[in-house]
């Protein structure tokens, strides 16, 4: 199945000159969504890991579905004020400012191997910040997995220390 047919291009969103790769048509189609999760699972089949960590919002969708398929635990990474227990935070730079992410401080045990999952790998900023959170808690980033990679933004440069697996590249 050609999953690209289920990814809609939205020009000038969220800013002029940006082409947003919208995965919601893929999520709407049960066969495409299942194929996407199956392909993501195939791409990480050789990676030894204990848990999947993924950011809100679309990362939750792909990360939790992949965790279910692979019989792994799932750890959410959220924006500040969304997690009910003690958290560990990281602030990181965006093209247009800064952002902050949080994870429960007890979410990862020392030495646990983590697979970081998200829908789109754009600049690599969010993924790099999450990797830093994982390390802060004593975890090891075993690899990363994304449905879509925007190669023209050179995200691998920022994530050069990590194994990167993607299903679709633009």
From Swiss-Prot:
Enzyme class: transferase
Reactions catalysed: AMP + diphosphate = 5-phospho-alpha-D-ribose 1-diphosphate + adenine
Subcellular location, record wording: Cytoplasm
Single Gene Ontology BP annotation: purine ribonucleoside salvage
EC number: 2.4.2.7
GO cellular component terms, semicolon-separated: cytoplasm
Pathway: Purine metabolism; AMP biosynthesis via salvage pathway; AMP from adenine: step 1/1
Entry keyword Cytoplasm: yes
Subunit and interaction comment: Homodimer.
Purpose: Catalyzes a salvage reaction resulting in the formation of AMP, that is energically less costly than de novo synthesis.
Family: Belongs to the purine/pyrimidine phosphoribosyltransferase family.
UniProt name for this protein: Adenine phosphoribosyltransferase
Biological source species: Pseudothermotoga lettingae (strain ATCC BAA-301 / DSM 14385 / NBRC 107922 / TMO)
Lineage: Bacteria, Thermotogati, Thermotogota, Thermotogae, Thermotogales
